[in-house]
Amino acid sequence: MASFSESLSQDPADAYKSAPSITKPMGPPSPGQPQWNPQRATSMPVFRYRPFAKEVEPIRLVDRTWPDRVIDCAPLWCAVDLRDGNQALIDPMSPICKRRMFDLLVRMGYKEIEVGFPSASQTDFDFVREIITDGTIPDDVTIQVLTQCRPELIERTFEACENASRVIVHFYNSTSILQRRVVFRADQATVKAIATDGARKCVEEAFKYPGTHWRFEYSPESYTGTELEYAKQVCDAVGEVIQPTPDNPIIFNLPATVEMATPNVYADSIEWMSRNLANRESVILSLHPHNDRGTAVAAAELGYHAGADRIEGCLFGNGERTGNVCLVTLGLNLFSRGVDPQIDFSNIDEIRRTVEYCNKLRVHERHPYGGDLVYTAFSGSHQDAINKGLDQMKIDADAADSDVDDILWQVPYLPIDPRDVGRTYEAVIRVNSQSGKGGVAYIMKADHGLELPRRLQIEFSRAIQKISEGEGGEITPTEMWDVFFEEYLSPVQPLERIKQRVNAAEEDGGSTSIAATVKINGEETEISGVGNGPLAAFIDALGHVGLQVAVLDYSEHAMNAGDDAQAAAYVEASVHGHTAWGVGIAPSITTASLRAVVSAVNRAMPR
Protein backbone atom coordinates (compact mmCIF):
# COMPACT_ATOMS: atom_id res chain seq x y z
CA MET A 1 0.00 0.00 0.00
CA ALA A 2 1.39 3.39 -0.98
CA SER A 3 2.12 5.87 1.78
CA PHE A 4 0.53 9.30 1.86
CA SER A 5 3.76 10.92 0.64
CA GLU A 6 4.08 8.36 -2.17
CA SER A 7 0.52 9.01 -3.28
CA LEU A 8 1.32 12.70 -3.73
CA SER A 9 4.23 11.83 -6.03
CA GLN A 10 2.01 9.90 -8.43
CA ASP A 11 0.83 11.21 -11.75
CA PRO A 12 -1.47 14.21 -11.09
CA ALA A 13 -4.32 12.43 -12.84
CA ASP A 14 -4.20 9.59 -10.29
CA ALA A 15 -3.05 11.41 -7.15
CA TYR A 16 -6.51 12.05 -5.75
CA LYS A 17 -8.26 8.81 -6.70
CA SER A 18 -9.49 6.73 -3.78
CA ALA A 19 -11.40 3.53 -3.04
CA PRO A 20 -11.37 2.07 -6.56
CA SER A 21 -13.51 -0.88 -5.42
CA ILE A 22 -16.49 1.37 -4.71
CA THR A 23 -19.07 1.58 -7.49
CA LYS A 24 -20.88 4.86 -7.90
CA PRO A 25 -24.65 4.39 -7.35
CA MET A 26 -26.33 4.45 -10.75
CA GLY A 27 -29.67 2.71 -10.09
CA PRO A 28 -33.14 4.22 -10.38
CA PRO A 29 -34.42 6.70 -7.79
CA SER A 30 -36.80 5.48 -5.12
CA PRO A 31 -40.53 5.62 -5.94
CA GLY A 32 -41.83 9.08 -5.14
CA GLN A 33 -38.34 10.53 -4.71
CA PRO A 34 -38.51 14.32 -5.30
CA GLN A 35 -36.84 15.77 -8.37
CA TRP A 36 -34.51 17.92 -6.25
CA ASN A 37 -32.88 14.77 -4.79
CA PRO A 38 -30.30 13.43 -7.29
CA GLN A 39 -29.34 10.29 -5.31
CA ARG A 40 -29.61 6.90 -6.98
CA ALA A 41 -29.99 3.28 -5.86
CA THR A 42 -26.84 1.33 -5.03
CA SER A 43 -25.86 -2.19 -6.03
CA MET A 44 -25.68 -3.27 -2.37
CA PRO A 45 -27.86 -6.35 -1.48
CA VAL A 46 -30.59 -4.42 0.35
CA PHE A 47 -33.01 -7.27 -0.45
CA ARG A 48 -31.31 -9.41 2.22
CA TYR A 49 -32.75 -7.23 5.00
CA ARG A 50 -36.25 -6.25 6.03
CA PRO A 51 -38.00 -3.64 8.13
CA PHE A 52 -38.07 -4.28 11.87
CA ALA A 53 -41.88 -4.41 11.87
CA LYS A 54 -41.71 -7.45 9.57
CA GLU A 55 -39.25 -9.22 11.87
CA VAL A 56 -40.94 -8.54 15.21
CA GLU A 57 -44.57 -7.49 15.24
CA PRO A 58 -44.67 -4.11 17.01
CA ILE A 59 -47.16 -3.05 19.63
CA ARG A 60 -49.08 0.02 18.47
CA LEU A 61 -48.88 2.51 21.32
CA VAL A 62 -51.12 5.28 20.03
CA ASP A 63 -51.48 6.90 23.46
CA ARG A 64 -47.77 6.96 24.29
CA THR A 65 -46.82 9.50 26.96
CA TRP A 66 -43.02 9.31 26.99
CA PRO A 67 -42.42 12.13 24.43
CA ASP A 68 -43.91 14.68 26.82
CA ARG A 69 -41.99 13.63 29.91
CA VAL A 70 -39.00 15.59 31.23
CA ILE A 71 -36.11 13.94 33.09
CA ASP A 72 -35.62 15.64 36.45
CA CYS A 73 -33.74 12.99 38.43
CA ALA A 74 -31.11 10.35 37.80
CA PRO A 75 -31.97 6.67 37.32
CA LEU A 76 -30.44 3.95 39.44
CA TRP A 77 -27.18 3.10 37.66
CA CYS A 78 -25.51 -0.29 37.39
CA ALA A 79 -21.96 -0.36 36.02
CA VAL A 80 -21.21 -3.58 34.13
CA ASP A 81 -17.60 -2.81 33.12
CA LEU A 82 -16.20 -5.76 35.08
CA ARG A 83 -18.35 -8.33 33.29
CA ASP A 84 -20.16 -7.21 30.16
CA GLY A 85 -17.36 -4.80 29.36
CA ASN A 86 -14.54 -7.13 30.34
CA GLN A 87 -15.77 -10.03 28.20
CA ALA A 88 -15.45 -7.83 25.10
CA LEU A 89 -11.78 -6.93 25.61
CA ILE A 90 -9.02 -8.35 23.44
CA ASP A 91 -7.03 -8.81 26.64
CA PRO A 92 -9.43 -9.24 29.59
CA MET A 93 -8.54 -7.37 32.75
CA SER A 94 -5.96 -8.80 35.11
CA PRO A 95 -6.93 -9.11 38.79
CA ILE A 96 -5.06 -5.85 39.48
CA CYS A 97 -6.97 -4.05 36.72
CA LYS A 98 -10.26 -5.41 38.03
CA ARG A 99 -9.51 -4.07 41.49
CA ARG A 100 -8.59 -0.67 40.05
CA MET A 101 -11.78 -0.57 38.00
CA PHE A 102 -13.88 -1.62 40.98
CA ASP A 103 -12.25 1.06 43.13
CA LEU A 104 -12.91 3.69 40.45
CA LEU A 105 -16.59 2.75 40.16
CA VAL A 106 -17.01 2.86 43.94
CA ARG A 107 -15.29 6.25 44.24
CA MET A 108 -17.44 7.67 41.46
CA GLY A 109 -20.56 6.69 43.40
CA TYR A 110 -21.98 3.61 41.65
CA LYS A 111 -24.04 1.60 44.14
CA GLU A 112 -24.70 -1.46 41.97
CA ILE A 113 -21.67 -2.98 40.24
CA GLU A 114 -21.67 -6.15 38.18
CA VAL A 115 -18.46 -7.90 39.18
CA GLY A 116 -18.39 -11.08 37.13
CA PHE A 117 -19.79 -14.33 35.82
CA PRO A 118 -18.32 -16.60 38.52
CA SER A 119 -19.72 -19.84 37.12
CA ALA A 120 -18.19 -19.17 33.70
CA SER A 121 -14.53 -18.83 34.67
CA GLN A 122 -12.25 -19.49 37.60
CA THR A 123 -10.82 -15.98 37.19
CA ASP A 124 -14.22 -14.39 37.77
CA PHE A 125 -14.96 -16.77 40.64
CA ASP A 126 -11.67 -15.92 42.34
CA PHE A 127 -12.21 -12.18 41.90
CA VAL A 128 -15.66 -12.32 43.49
CA ARG A 129 -14.28 -14.32 46.40
CA GLU A 130 -11.36 -11.90 46.77
CA ILE A 131 -13.42 -8.72 47.07
CA ILE A 132 -15.78 -10.44 49.53
CA THR A 133 -13.14 -11.98 51.79
CA ASP A 134 -10.92 -8.87 51.69
CA GLY A 135 -13.78 -6.65 52.83
CA THR A 136 -13.42 -4.51 49.70
CA ILE A 137 -17.15 -3.95 49.14
CA PRO A 138 -18.50 -0.85 50.94
CA ASP A 139 -21.63 -1.23 53.04
CA ASP A 140 -23.74 0.80 50.60
CA VAL A 141 -22.63 -1.06 47.45
CA THR A 142 -24.38 -4.15 46.10
CA ILE A 143 -22.44 -6.46 43.82
CA GLN A 144 -24.17 -8.13 40.89
CA VAL A 145 -23.22 -11.51 39.43
CA LEU A 146 -24.37 -13.00 36.15
CA THR A 147 -25.45 -16.57 35.47
CA GLN A 148 -27.33 -18.60 32.93
CA CYS A 149 -30.32 -20.61 34.11
CA ARG A 150 -28.60 -23.99 34.33
CA PRO A 151 -28.79 -25.47 37.88
CA GLU A 152 -25.09 -26.23 38.25
CA LEU A 153 -24.15 -22.70 37.16
CA ILE A 154 -26.58 -21.15 39.63
CA GLU A 155 -25.16 -23.29 42.45
CA ARG A 156 -21.62 -22.18 41.57
CA THR A 157 -22.77 -18.55 41.48
CA PHE A 158 -24.18 -18.68 45.01
CA GLU A 159 -21.06 -20.46 46.21
CA ALA A 160 -18.93 -17.59 44.89
CA CYS A 161 -21.01 -15.04 46.79
CA GLU A 162 -20.98 -16.74 50.19
CA ASN A 163 -20.70 -14.28 53.10
CA ALA A 164 -21.37 -11.21 50.96
CA SER A 165 -23.72 -8.69 52.57
CA ARG A 166 -25.86 -7.89 49.53
CA VAL A 167 -25.92 -9.55 46.13
CA ILE A 168 -28.02 -9.25 42.98
CA VAL A 169 -28.13 -12.58 41.16
CA HIS A 170 -28.76 -11.78 37.51
CA PHE A 171 -30.04 -14.79 35.60
CA TYR A 172 -31.02 -14.77 31.95
CA ASN A 173 -31.98 -16.75 28.89
CA SER A 174 -32.55 -15.69 25.32
CA THR A 175 -36.18 -15.35 24.27
CA SER A 176 -36.01 -13.85 20.77
CA ILE A 177 -37.76 -15.29 17.74
CA LEU A 178 -34.45 -15.82 15.95
CA GLN A 179 -32.67 -17.54 18.83
CA ARG A 180 -35.66 -19.76 19.62
CA ARG A 181 -35.58 -20.91 16.01
CA VAL A 182 -31.85 -21.06 15.28
CA VAL A 183 -30.07 -21.62 18.61
CA PHE A 184 -32.50 -23.46 20.88
CA ARG A 185 -34.91 -24.88 18.30
CA ALA A 186 -37.56 -24.68 20.98
CA ASP A 187 -41.07 -23.31 21.29
CA GLN A 188 -42.24 -20.49 23.56
CA ALA A 189 -43.32 -22.78 26.39
CA THR A 190 -39.94 -24.53 26.52
CA VAL A 191 -38.00 -21.26 26.58
CA LYS A 192 -40.28 -19.84 29.29
CA ALA A 193 -39.72 -22.98 31.37
CA ILE A 194 -35.96 -22.37 31.22
CA ALA A 195 -36.55 -18.98 32.86
CA THR A 196 -38.95 -20.20 35.55
CA ASP A 197 -36.80 -23.23 36.37
CA GLY A 198 -33.85 -20.88 36.78
CA ALA A 199 -35.89 -18.63 39.07
CA ARG A 200 -36.91 -21.58 41.25
CA LYS A 201 -33.30 -22.71 41.52
CA CYS A 202 -32.22 -19.20 42.56
CA VAL A 203 -34.85 -19.10 45.32
CA GLU A 204 -33.80 -22.57 46.47
CA GLU A 205 -30.11 -21.62 46.64
CA ALA A 206 -30.82 -18.36 48.45
CA PHE A 207 -32.30 -20.29 51.39
CA LYS A 208 -28.93 -22.02 51.84
CA TYR A 209 -27.17 -18.70 52.51
CA PRO A 210 -29.38 -16.81 54.99
CA GLY A 211 -26.61 -14.38 55.96
CA THR A 212 -26.81 -12.58 52.62
CA HIS A 213 -29.53 -10.22 51.44
CA TRP A 214 -30.32 -11.65 48.02
CA ARG A 215 -32.03 -9.77 45.22
CA PHE A 216 -32.84 -11.10 41.80
CA GLU A 217 -32.62 -9.75 38.28
CA TYR A 218 -34.00 -11.48 35.23
CA SER A 219 -33.24 -10.58 31.61
CA PRO A 220 -35.17 -11.91 28.62
CA GLU A 221 -31.97 -11.80 26.56
CA SER A 222 -32.39 -10.45 23.01
CA TYR A 223 -35.48 -8.64 24.25
CA THR A 224 -35.62 -6.36 21.21
CA GLY A 225 -36.06 -9.41 18.99
CA THR A 226 -38.81 -10.88 21.19
CA GLU A 227 -42.57 -10.44 20.83
CA LEU A 228 -43.66 -8.01 23.56
CA GLU A 229 -46.62 -10.10 24.68
CA TYR A 230 -44.32 -13.09 25.07
CA ALA A 231 -41.61 -11.08 26.88
CA LYS A 232 -44.28 -9.95 29.36
CA GLN A 233 -45.50 -13.53 29.84
CA VAL A 234 -41.99 -14.76 30.64
CA CYS A 235 -41.28 -11.89 33.06
CA ASP A 236 -44.62 -12.35 34.80
CA ALA A 237 -43.97 -16.08 35.16
CA VAL A 238 -40.55 -15.41 36.68
CA GLY A 239 -42.13 -12.88 39.05
CA GLU A 240 -44.64 -15.46 40.24
CA VAL A 241 -41.74 -17.69 41.27
CA ILE A 242 -39.63 -14.97 42.92
CA GLN A 243 -42.60 -13.33 44.70
CA PRO A 244 -41.12 -9.82 44.92
CA THR A 245 -42.52 -7.08 47.14
CA PRO A 246 -42.27 -3.28 46.98
CA ASP A 247 -39.64 -3.48 49.73
CA ASN A 248 -37.69 -6.22 47.96
CA PRO A 249 -38.45 -5.78 44.26
CA ILE A 250 -37.25 -7.90 41.37
CA ILE A 251 -35.29 -6.29 38.55
CA PHE A 252 -36.60 -6.99 35.07
CA ASN A 253 -33.83 -5.98 32.70
CA LEU A 254 -34.95 -5.40 29.10
CA PRO A 255 -31.79 -5.43 27.00
CA ALA A 256 -31.29 -4.21 23.49
CA THR A 257 -28.82 -7.08 23.22
CA VAL A 258 -28.65 -6.18 19.55
CA GLU A 259 -29.94 -2.74 18.64
CA MET A 260 -32.51 -3.46 15.92
CA ALA A 261 -34.65 -0.35 15.47
CA THR A 262 -34.82 3.37 16.13
CA PRO A 263 -34.83 4.57 19.77
CA ASN A 264 -38.51 5.51 19.68
CA VAL A 265 -39.42 1.87 19.00
CA TYR A 266 -37.44 0.81 22.08
CA ALA A 267 -39.13 3.55 24.13
CA ASP A 268 -42.58 2.40 23.00
CA SER A 269 -41.77 -1.15 24.08
CA ILE A 270 -40.56 0.04 27.49
CA GLU A 271 -43.68 2.11 28.11
CA TRP A 272 -45.86 -0.83 27.07
CA MET A 273 -44.01 -3.19 29.42
CA SER A 274 -44.12 -0.66 32.26
CA ARG A 275 -47.89 -0.39 31.86
CA ASN A 276 -48.59 -4.09 31.48
CA LEU A 277 -46.18 -6.03 33.70
CA ALA A 278 -47.91 -7.72 36.63
CA ASN A 279 -47.16 -6.45 40.13
CA ARG A 280 -45.42 -3.38 38.68
CA GLU A 281 -44.96 -1.76 42.10
CA SER A 282 -42.64 -4.66 42.99
CA VAL A 283 -40.57 -4.34 39.82
CA ILE A 284 -37.49 -2.25 39.04
CA LEU A 285 -37.56 -1.85 35.27
CA SER A 286 -34.02 -1.81 33.92
CA LEU A 287 -32.49 -0.93 30.54
CA HIS A 288 -29.38 -2.41 28.93
CA PRO A 289 -28.92 -0.85 25.49
CA HIS A 290 -26.17 -1.84 23.08
CA ASN A 291 -24.92 0.49 20.37
CA ASP A 292 -25.16 -1.53 17.15
CA ARG A 293 -27.02 1.27 15.35
CA GLY A 294 -25.13 4.04 17.15
CA THR A 295 -28.14 5.21 19.17
CA ALA A 296 -27.67 3.52 22.55
CA VAL A 297 -27.60 6.81 24.44
CA ALA A 298 -30.80 8.00 22.77
CA ALA A 299 -32.47 4.63 23.39
CA ALA A 300 -31.51 4.74 27.07
CA GLU A 301 -32.74 8.30 27.52
CA LEU A 302 -36.04 7.68 25.75
CA GLY A 303 -36.48 4.36 27.57
CA TYR A 304 -35.98 6.20 30.84
CA HIS A 305 -38.59 8.73 29.70
CA ALA A 306 -40.87 5.77 29.01
CA GLY A 307 -40.92 4.45 32.56
CA ALA A 308 -37.66 2.62 33.27
CA ASP A 309 -36.07 2.97 36.70
CA ARG A 310 -32.53 1.73 36.15
CA ILE A 311 -29.82 1.68 33.44
CA GLU A 312 -26.91 -0.71 32.97
CA GLY A 313 -23.86 0.37 30.97
CA CYS A 314 -20.11 0.88 30.85
CA LEU A 315 -17.78 3.84 31.21
CA PHE A 316 -17.02 5.23 27.75
CA GLY A 317 -19.25 2.62 26.14
CA ASN A 318 -17.05 -0.47 26.23
CA GLY A 319 -18.77 -3.76 25.39
CA GLU A 320 -19.39 -6.38 22.73
CA ARG A 321 -19.30 -5.25 19.08
CA THR A 322 -20.07 -1.52 19.14
CA GLY A 323 -20.33 -1.45 22.92
CA ASN A 324 -22.78 -0.91 25.75
CA VAL A 325 -24.39 2.44 26.39
CA CYS A 326 -21.87 4.96 27.72
CA LEU A 327 -22.48 5.83 31.37
CA VAL A 328 -20.25 8.90 31.07
CA THR A 329 -22.36 10.35 28.27
CA LEU A 330 -25.64 9.55 30.02
CA GLY A 331 -24.48 11.03 33.32
CA LEU A 332 -23.04 14.22 31.89
CA ASN A 333 -26.03 14.69 29.59
CA LEU A 334 -28.09 14.93 32.78
CA PHE A 335 -25.51 17.24 34.36
CA SER A 336 -25.54 19.54 31.31
CA ARG A 337 -29.28 20.10 31.79
CA GLY A 338 -29.07 20.77 35.52
CA VAL A 339 -29.86 17.26 36.82
CA ASP A 340 -27.43 15.73 39.33
CA PRO A 341 -26.33 12.33 37.92
CA GLN A 342 -25.40 11.26 41.48
CA ILE A 343 -22.08 10.11 40.00
CA ASP A 344 -18.85 12.15 40.32
CA PHE A 345 -17.33 13.11 36.96
CA SER A 346 -15.33 16.03 38.35
CA ASN A 347 -12.00 14.66 37.03
CA ILE A 348 -12.86 13.19 33.66
CA ASP A 349 -9.22 12.69 32.65
CA GLU A 350 -8.45 10.63 35.75
CA ILE A 351 -11.50 8.49 35.00
CA ARG A 352 -10.42 8.12 31.38
CA ARG A 353 -6.83 7.21 32.27
CA THR A 354 -8.03 4.45 34.60
CA VAL A 355 -10.47 3.09 32.02
CA GLU A 356 -7.83 3.16 29.28
CA TYR A 357 -5.35 1.42 31.57
CA CYS A 358 -7.78 -1.31 32.58
CA ASN A 359 -9.38 -1.86 29.17
CA LYS A 360 -6.22 -1.31 27.09
CA LEU A 361 -8.45 0.63 24.70
CA ARG A 362 -8.05 4.29 23.80
CA VAL A 363 -10.95 6.65 24.34
CA HIS A 364 -11.53 8.41 21.04
CA GLU A 365 -10.58 12.07 20.79
CA ARG A 366 -14.17 12.92 19.86
CA HIS A 367 -15.89 10.83 22.54
CA PRO A 368 -18.50 13.02 24.28
CA TYR A 369 -17.23 14.79 27.39
CA GLY A 370 -14.03 12.72 27.76
CA GLY A 371 -12.16 12.91 24.45
CA ASP A 372 -9.09 15.10 24.07
CA LEU A 373 -10.74 17.32 21.46
CA VAL A 374 -14.31 17.70 22.70
CA TYR A 375 -13.75 21.12 24.26
CA THR A 376 -11.53 22.32 21.41
CA ALA A 377 -12.64 24.57 18.56
CA PHE A 378 -10.56 24.64 15.38
CA SER A 379 -12.94 26.91 13.49
CA GLY A 380 -12.13 30.60 13.78
CA SER A 381 -15.80 31.56 14.10
CA HIS A 382 -16.30 29.00 16.85
CA GLN A 383 -13.26 30.29 18.71
CA ASP A 384 -14.56 33.83 18.42
CA ALA A 385 -17.99 32.85 19.78
CA ILE A 386 -16.43 30.93 22.67
CA ASN A 387 -14.15 33.83 23.55
CA LYS A 388 -17.08 36.25 23.54
CA GLY A 389 -19.13 33.85 25.64
CA LEU A 390 -16.37 33.55 28.24
CA ASP A 391 -15.97 37.33 28.31
CA GLN A 392 -19.72 37.76 28.80
CA MET A 393 -19.65 35.26 31.66
CA LYS A 394 -17.14 37.49 33.46
CA ILE A 395 -19.27 40.57 32.80
CA ASP A 396 -22.42 38.82 34.09
CA ALA A 397 -20.58 37.59 37.19
CA ASP A 398 -19.30 41.07 38.00
CA ALA A 399 -22.78 42.52 37.52
CA ALA A 400 -24.19 39.95 39.94
CA ASP A 401 -21.31 40.50 42.39
CA SER A 402 -20.63 36.78 42.11
CA ASP A 403 -17.85 34.43 41.13
CA VAL A 404 -17.96 33.27 37.51
CA ASP A 405 -18.08 29.65 38.73
CA ASP A 406 -21.32 30.36 40.59
CA ILE A 407 -23.45 31.68 37.72
CA LEU A 408 -25.38 29.93 34.97
CA TRP A 409 -23.09 28.49 32.29
CA GLN A 410 -23.90 29.99 28.89
CA VAL A 411 -21.08 29.78 26.34
CA PRO A 412 -21.62 28.97 22.65
CA TYR A 413 -20.39 25.58 21.42
CA LEU A 414 -19.56 24.31 24.93
CA PRO A 415 -22.47 22.42 26.53
CA ILE A 416 -20.69 22.35 29.90
CA ASP A 417 -17.86 24.27 31.54
CA PRO A 418 -14.73 22.15 30.95
CA ARG A 419 -13.51 23.10 34.42
CA ASP A 420 -16.51 21.31 35.95
CA VAL A 421 -14.99 18.02 34.77
CA GLY A 422 -11.39 18.92 35.56
CA ARG A 423 -10.36 20.36 32.20
CA THR A 424 -8.92 23.83 31.53
CA TYR A 425 -9.72 26.57 29.04
CA GLU A 426 -6.25 26.51 27.50
CA ALA A 427 -7.05 24.06 24.72
CA VAL A 428 -10.38 25.80 24.11
CA ILE A 429 -9.27 29.37 23.58
CA ARG A 430 -5.68 28.92 22.40
CA VAL A 431 -5.68 26.41 19.56
CA ASN A 432 -4.06 26.17 16.15
CA SER A 433 -5.66 24.91 12.99
CA GLN A 434 -6.19 21.16 12.81
CA SER A 435 -3.82 20.90 9.87
CA GLY A 436 -1.14 22.68 11.89
CA LYS A 437 -1.23 20.10 14.66
CA GLY A 438 -1.64 17.27 12.22
CA GLY A 439 1.36 18.43 10.21
CA VAL A 440 3.58 18.72 13.29
CA ALA A 441 2.56 15.26 14.49
CA TYR A 442 3.10 13.74 11.02
CA ILE A 443 6.64 15.18 10.62
CA MET A 444 7.67 14.23 14.15
CA LYS A 445 6.60 10.65 13.50
CA ALA A 446 7.67 10.28 9.86
CA ASP A 447 11.03 12.09 10.14
CA HIS A 448 12.00 11.61 13.77
CA GLY A 449 10.17 8.46 14.90
CA LEU A 450 8.30 10.18 17.73
CA GLU A 451 4.61 9.41 18.26
CA LEU A 452 3.68 12.35 20.44
CA PRO A 453 0.65 11.94 22.74
CA ARG A 454 -2.26 14.11 21.70
CA ARG A 455 -1.90 16.73 24.43
CA LEU A 456 1.83 16.97 23.82
CA GLN A 457 1.09 17.46 20.10
CA ILE A 458 -1.08 20.42 21.00
CA GLU A 459 1.54 21.89 23.32
CA PHE A 460 4.45 21.47 20.92
CA SER A 461 2.50 22.73 17.90
CA ARG A 462 1.98 26.00 19.75
CA ALA A 463 5.74 26.45 19.99
CA ILE A 464 6.13 25.73 16.28
CA GLN A 465 3.28 28.08 15.38
CA LYS A 466 4.81 30.85 17.48
CA ILE A 467 8.11 30.54 15.63
CA SER A 468 6.37 30.30 12.27
CA GLU A 469 4.34 33.43 12.92
CA GLY A 470 7.38 35.31 14.23
CA GLU A 471 9.86 34.38 11.51
CA GLY A 472 7.50 33.63 8.64
CA GLY A 473 7.91 30.87 6.10
CA GLU A 474 7.97 27.11 6.50
CA ILE A 475 9.45 25.24 9.43
CA THR A 476 11.55 22.39 8.04
CA PRO A 477 11.77 18.96 9.75
CA THR A 478 15.32 19.78 10.87
CA GLU A 479 14.25 23.10 12.36
CA MET A 480 11.33 21.38 14.05
CA TRP A 481 13.67 18.84 15.63
CA ASP A 482 15.95 21.63 16.87
CA VAL A 483 13.00 23.31 18.60
CA PHE A 484 11.90 19.99 20.12
CA PHE A 485 15.40 19.17 21.35
CA GLU A 486 15.86 22.59 22.92
CA GLU A 487 12.45 22.50 24.61
CA TYR A 488 12.24 18.91 25.85
CA LEU A 489 15.62 17.15 25.69
CA SER A 490 18.26 19.79 26.37
CA PRO A 491 17.46 21.35 29.78
CA VAL A 492 19.56 19.98 32.69
CA GLN A 493 18.62 22.54 35.34
CA PRO A 494 17.73 22.26 38.13
CA LEU A 495 17.85 18.43 37.82
CA GLU A 496 20.32 16.26 35.93
CA ARG A 497 20.39 12.46 36.03
CA ILE A 498 23.88 11.00 35.80
CA LYS A 499 23.39 7.27 36.37
CA GLN A 500 21.17 4.80 38.16
CA ARG A 501 21.09 1.22 39.39
CA VAL A 502 17.74 -0.58 39.41
CA ASN A 503 16.92 -3.74 41.35
CA ALA A 504 13.73 -5.09 39.82
CA ALA A 505 11.26 -7.22 41.75
CA GLU A 506 11.59 -10.94 41.05
CA GLU A 507 7.90 -11.63 41.65
CA ASP A 508 4.74 -9.98 40.36
CA GLY A 509 3.53 -7.36 42.80
CA GLY A 510 6.96 -6.96 44.42
CA SER A 511 8.82 -3.72 44.93
CA THR A 512 11.55 -2.26 42.72
CA SER A 513 14.36 -0.22 44.26
CA ILE A 514 16.58 2.37 42.63
CA ALA A 515 19.81 4.10 43.59
CA ALA A 516 20.69 7.07 41.40
CA THR A 517 23.28 9.77 41.11
CA VAL A 518 21.83 13.15 40.18
CA LYS A 519 22.79 16.79 40.18
CA ILE A 520 20.42 19.28 41.78
CA ASN A 521 21.30 22.86 40.93
CA GLY A 522 24.75 21.63 39.96
CA GLU A 523 25.43 19.74 43.19
CA GLU A 524 25.93 16.00 42.84
CA THR A 525 23.97 13.83 45.27
CA GLU A 526 22.92 10.20 45.78
CA ILE A 527 19.21 9.37 46.00
CA SER A 528 17.28 6.14 46.49
CA GLY A 529 13.66 5.06 46.41
CA VAL A 530 11.23 2.16 46.22
CA GLY A 531 8.11 1.65 44.09
CA ASN A 532 6.14 -0.80 41.98
CA GLY A 533 8.50 -0.16 39.04
CA PRO A 534 11.58 1.88 38.10
CA LEU A 535 9.54 4.99 37.34
CA ALA A 536 7.67 4.90 40.66
CA ALA A 537 10.91 4.17 42.53
CA PHE A 538 12.66 7.15 40.90
CA ILE A 539 9.77 9.47 41.76
CA ASP A 540 9.89 8.19 45.34
CA ALA A 541 13.63 8.95 45.41
CA LEU A 542 13.05 12.49 44.15
CA GLY A 543 10.52 13.00 46.92
CA HIS A 544 13.23 12.34 49.50
CA VAL A 545 15.17 15.38 48.22
CA GLY A 546 12.18 17.70 48.16
CA LEU A 547 10.95 17.24 44.59
CA GLN A 548 7.25 16.36 44.75
CA VAL A 549 6.37 14.73 41.43
CA ALA A 550 3.10 13.02 40.41
CA VAL A 551 2.74 11.31 37.02
CA LEU A 552 -0.52 12.27 35.29
CA ASP A 553 0.03 10.47 31.98
CA TYR A 554 2.69 8.17 30.58
CA SER A 555 3.34 6.50 27.24
CA GLU A 556 6.28 4.85 25.54
CA HIS A 557 7.24 3.25 22.23
CA ALA A 558 10.21 1.94 20.26
CA MET A 559 11.47 4.49 17.76
CA ASN A 560 12.97 1.91 15.39
CA ALA A 561 13.87 -1.76 15.15
CA GLY A 562 17.17 -3.61 15.30
CA ASP A 563 20.17 -3.83 17.59
CA ASP A 564 20.51 -0.05 17.80
CA ALA A 565 16.84 0.56 18.58
CA GLN A 566 15.98 3.63 20.62
CA ALA A 567 12.99 4.01 22.93
CA ALA A 568 10.98 7.16 23.58
CA ALA A 569 9.01 7.89 26.75
CA TYR A 570 6.59 10.72 27.46
CA VAL A 571 5.55 11.84 30.93
CA GLU A 572 2.95 14.43 31.88
CA ALA A 573 3.74 15.29 35.48
CA SER A 574 2.66 17.61 38.24
CA VAL A 575 5.73 19.10 39.95
CA HIS A 576 4.87 21.10 43.06
CA GLY A 577 1.48 21.81 41.49
CA HIS A 578 2.85 22.84 38.08
CA THR A 579 2.01 20.54 35.16
CA ALA A 580 4.52 19.91 32.38
CA TRP A 581 5.35 17.35 29.71
CA GLY A 582 8.74 15.68 29.64
CA VAL A 583 10.37 13.51 26.99
CA GLY A 584 13.18 10.97 27.25
CA ILE A 585 15.03 9.07 24.52
CA ALA A 586 17.47 6.23 25.25
CA PRO A 587 18.37 2.69 24.16
CA SER A 588 16.65 1.41 27.34
CA ILE A 589 12.98 2.12 28.01
CA THR A 590 13.80 2.38 31.72
CA THR A 591 16.41 5.06 31.09
CA ALA A 592 14.09 6.82 28.63
CA SER A 593 11.29 6.96 31.21
CA LEU A 594 13.62 8.39 33.88
CA ARG A 595 14.89 10.99 31.43
CA ALA A 596 11.29 11.92 30.68
CA VAL A 597 10.65 12.54 34.37
CA VAL A 598 13.79 14.70 34.59
CA SER A 599 12.63 16.61 31.50
CA ALA A 600 9.21 17.24 33.05
CA VAL A 601 10.75 18.41 36.33
CA ASN A 602 13.08 20.85 34.56
CA ARG A 603 10.30 22.23 32.39
CA ALA A 604 7.98 22.67 35.37
CA MET A 605 10.56 24.36 37.60
CA PRO A 606 11.73 27.97 37.13
CA ARG A 607 14.90 28.21 35.07
UniProtKB/Swiss-Prot annotation:
Segments of this protein annotated with the region Regulatory domain: 491-607
Names of the cofactor(s): Mg(2+)
GO CC term (a single one): cytoplasm
Region ranges (Disordered): 1-40
PROSITE patterns in the cross-refs: AIPM_HOMOCIT_SYNTH_1, AIPM_HOMOCIT_SYNTH_2, PYR_CT
Polar residues biased stretches: 1-10
Pathway: Amino-acid biosynthesis; L-leucine biosynthesis; L-leucine from 3-methyl-2-oxobutanoate: step 1/4
Predominant place of localization: cytoplasm
A UniProt-annotated Pfam family: LeuA_dimer
GO molecular function term, any single one: acetyl-CoA C-acetyltransferase activity
Domain Pyruvate carboxyltransferase: 75-349
UniProt KW keywords: Amino-acid biosynthesis, Branched-chain amino acid biosynthesis, Cytoplasm, Leucine biosynthesis, Magnesium, Metal-binding, Transferase
EC number: 2.3.3.13
Subunit structure: Homodimer.
Biological role: Catalyzes the condensation of the acetyl group of acetyl-CoA with 3-methyl-2-oxobutanoate (2-ketoisovalerate) to form 3-carboxy-3-hydroxy-4-methylpentanoate (2-isopropylmalate).
Family: Belongs to the alpha-IPM synthase/homocitrate synthase family. LeuA type 2 subfamily.
NCBIfam families: leuA_yeast, PRK03739.1
Protein name: 2-isopropylmalate synthase
